[in-house]
């Protein structure tokens, strides 16, 4: 236990350093100590628990959510933007801008970027703004397309991203769903389809939209040949809560709805997990459950989301943690 005199010296040095902003050399000069001793006493004070730093920056609650998401789910990065009063276009545009900035910070020439469909991916592509040329980057769809809807037209999204990056873009000329498993097997074995999916399998970066299978709020039904009844069946029979690349998973992130998965012209969840860096992009309270399942399944290395979704995800974690303890 330090003596009163030593504790008083600790307090003086800590006040000068943290409260008045003096450098260690100026503190040493004022107190007649060596700079090395001041440094040593500061370190010792931290070890003794005399220093309690509280950070109160604007939007601190968002940064705290990011920290907790990373700690709870073991992801490398989390970016949480404010939820807007207009939960539609304003949030989507802000989310796309944040995701595009994060993506560009990590993009390296020579990367193969695989993308899924969705409004958040479309917003991210639209927000890409760079003067740098990524001529060695390749952009590839990991799922078939539905023509006529920009956010679900994989070939449009890949081409648009390629143009913005000055990168090579591939197109996958196949539907999202085949009529039957046999038809799906036949399509996936076609050279022009197989070659594109093989490139996607060798991607080292993935941009992933995270969708809900709730037919009342999901755009997934609009993107695919599945009906609202199909979605209800998946949710009720196998406990599906979300989808990535049209592949449905339950609350623990386990794949489900195999009879539908067999018809998908795209990567499987297991194949997506082999991509070295996977960025999930999704927002709104309705996406909390799908995001939670995706994080539980280990499908994401990074998450770009909004406050409403982040709070919902952490509430789900707390509820499940209490239930299991």
Q: For each predicted feature, which ranges?
A:
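Conserved phosphate- and dinucleotide-binding cores of soluble alpha/beta proteins
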Residues: 2-14, 18-19, 23-26, 32, ...
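HTH-adjacent hinge/linker in prokaryotic transcriptional regulators
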Residues: 4, 43-112, 125-135, 145-157
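A short, small-residue-rich loop immediately preceding and capping a beta-strand
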Residues: 32, 110-117
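Conserved beta-strand segments of alpha/beta enzyme cores
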Residues: 76-79, 138, 168-170, 247
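A general structural motif
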Residues: 108-112, 134-136, 203, 275, ...
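Conserved beta-strand elements of the Class I
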Residues: 113-114, 140, 279
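Glycine-rich beta-strand-to-loop/alpha-helix junction loops that act as flexible
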Residues: 115-120, 307
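Short Gly/Thr/Asp-enriched flexible loops that form oxyanion-binding sites at enzyme active sites
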Residues: 120-132, 218-229
